[in-house]
Design a protein with these regions (language model features):
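Conserved HGGG/HGGXW glycine-rich cap/lid loop of the alpha/beta-hydrolase fold
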Residues: 9-57
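Conserved acidic catalytic loop of the alpha/beta-hydrolase fold
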Residues: 68-84
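Short beta-strand immediately N-terminal to the catalytic nucleophile in serine-hydrolase-like folds
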Residues: 86-88, 113
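Flexible "cap/lid" loop of the alpha/beta hydrolase fold
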Residues: 94-102, 108-136
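Active-site nucleophile elbow and catalytic-triad environment of alpha/beta-hydrolase enzymes
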Residues: 144-159, 174
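Short beta-strand/loop motif that positions the catalytic acidic residue
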Residues: 163, 169-171
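Conserved alpha/beta-hydrolase "acid-adjacent" motif
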Residues: 176-181
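Catalytic histidine-centered segment of alpha/beta-hydrolase-like enzymes
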Residues: 200-209
Length: 225
């Protein structure tokens, strides 16, 4: 799929309620294979790789901002031609929150997996960004693609209460950094269910895809059609 002259790798399968899957930083759409297999009946599953990840194009540095990525996500959501369920892991969860703020009418429900809402304090954002940049130097990723994982402001966390879509929160028992975000989501979002997966870490959707898929299936079954 071409979005603004950048080819985005998209996988689609099934028919029914459209679900858009957005992975985390330095991952790709195959992270969702196990979950999608479990949700093969009754759902139109659409997984994509963020620009600079997986089989998607890697444009030059300066083309990986939040707005660039949200622009790609918008075009993918529009493929569904109806409100979608957004499922996001880590960075993908943050981007899904941002998308909800920009296009609330396009979102039926939201599933946040090992995700965070960003940071209010500039000092904390700078610490996070420094950690991302340091990690990027040690990784085999396209130049500049780490920009997608940087936090430039507190817009998302400051605006959480504006999101009205029903939410499912999933986190691994051992993922302490992102487990702390659960209380924030419960305070500001319409969280219908929170699931802690025993023994799981940050990649809960990969290693415990059955538990994650079952939680999503249960959550969507109780939502109005």
């Amino acid at each position: 799929m071409d979005t603004n002259k950048v080819n985005i790798d998209v996988f689609e399968s099934g028919e029914g309620i459209p679900i858009i899957y957005t992975h985390g930083w330095a991952d790709d759409r195959t992270a969702w294979d196990g979950v999608i297999q479990l949700l093969s009946e009754g759902f139109r599953n659409i997984a994509w790789s963020i620009r600079g990840h997986g089989e998607s194009d890697a444009p030059p540095p300066g083309n990986y901002t939040r707005d660039h990525t949200l622009g790609d996500l918008t075009q993918i959501v529009d493929m569904a031609n109806s409100p979608v369920v957004l499922v996001g892991h880590s960075l993908g969860g943050y981007l899904s929150l941002a998308f909800c703020l920009k296009h609330p009418e396009k979102v039926k429900a939201l599933v946040l997996i090992a995700a965070g809402p960003g940071f209010r304090k500039e000092e904390t954002r700078e610490q996070w960004n420094a950690s991302v940049r340091a990690s990027a130097k040690e990784m085999d990723i396209p130049d500049g693609s780490e920009e997608a994982a940087l936090h430039i402001d507190s817009w998302v966390i400051d605006s959480l209460s504006e999101i009205s879509a029903p939410v499912l929160v999933i986190v691994g028992e051992n993922d302490k950094r992102f487990a702390a975000s659960m209380a924030v989501f419960q305070k500001y979002l319409d969280v219908r269910e929170s699931v802690v997966v025993p023994g799981a870490g940050h990649s809960v959707h990969r290693k415990y895809s059955s538990a994650v898929g079952s939680a999503i299936q249960r959550f969507l079954s109780i939502l109005p059609s």
